[in-house]
């Protein structure tokens, strides 16, 4: 019954909202319309921010911590990158190419470029409306908190909780439980292929190690500080090396991506509509722009200007999808199609790495996925802190209960079917995006005003 409910909500969010009568019918989902419309609108309103202010985005990474509490700019980027560069860049890209073909990669790029401006708006608002965190110290915030501010303004009085803000918080907790399932499902599959270890064994070991880390107070950020830079550099160096070694094949890969992106070559069932939907869906899962996840980390940073935190998160979206997701996609697309035909999920990625690096490739991607999975799991639990506190108040029991639920979802995910696991995460992130947009549309003018003020001050320097 629960599976049927998840599938029904999934179809409502990601199923065809309408069909364009071209090439046998192009199905467009509600979420595709929402994300593209918002992305185009915010990109225009910020006057092509990702291009215009790219240098400022780079400079924001080097901002020094302004106080003793909270996170530095680098730590904030690390936490949001942990979830983006974690499962999204491996499992998300694999899922996009498996279901949408090579053309889905192009639509992931488009989603990221448009999403950078959306990420700027939501992260700037999160920084502006953050609150002190009495449990963990520092700051907390995110869409639940600026949705609460919006509700109080419209009602004209103080509220203990807002319905829409609570719905966002619940959707986020559902999404992050879904991501927990994707983590164990993918890692157990990878370890079974690489080392012939039974999925249940891998899942239980993964859960035990995760429990040791997450049930401690502030171990999450400390673990990510060390883990993310090392794993990201290792993965990036090896994948770029493979791409450079296969440089003569890249023009054909780009040709395939663009041909399948616009339906010039039929690659998957459902044609252009399936390519577009899977690219946007997995692009959102990978870079999180507009979903409201990354602002939960942005709110925790010590920063002298909310605009700089917006720059930081916009940069994270571009690093994630345009750079690292592309590397993962190229790993698979540089392999002859007859070798990967009929493969999906981690089987596809591991076969691709085996083609490029031999037996080492299978072991490398399994180990990398395990590290990425830990970073993602720790990252989403960090996101969950403020949302659990918004729903249940400032107490340790609610924080611990959610951590235990997330750990339980790790166990369940390792034994579930691949598609069912993805559907729960997609439902959660879809609902989060809808509730987040309810706040972003009317409150965007505040972030835009802050941006204009920043640019005026910059001219005077």
Regions picked out by a protein language model, each given a short descriptive name:
Residues 48-73, 95, 101-102, 117-159, ...:
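Flexible loop linkers connecting adjacent transmembrane helices
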Residues 67-99, 125-128, 135-150, 167-170, ...:
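Alpha-helical membrane segments and immediately flanking helix-loop junctions
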Residues 1-87, 97-104, 115, 439-461:
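N-terminal alpha-helical transmembrane segments of multi-pass membrane transport
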Residues 114-122, 202-217, 228-248, 281-284, ...:
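Selective recognition of specific alpha-helical transmembrane segments in multi-pass small-molecule
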Residues 38-43, 114-139, 148-185, 189-213, ...:
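Helix-loop-helix module between adjacent transmembrane segments
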Residues 45-50, 89-93, 175-188, 211-223, ...:
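Transmembrane helix-loop junctions in multi-pass membrane proteins
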Residues 34-35, 42-58, 164, 172, ...:
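Membrane-interface loop-to-helix entry segments
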Residues 122-134, 240-256, 270, 300-303, ...:
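Extracellular/periplasmic helix-exit of transmembrane alpha-helices
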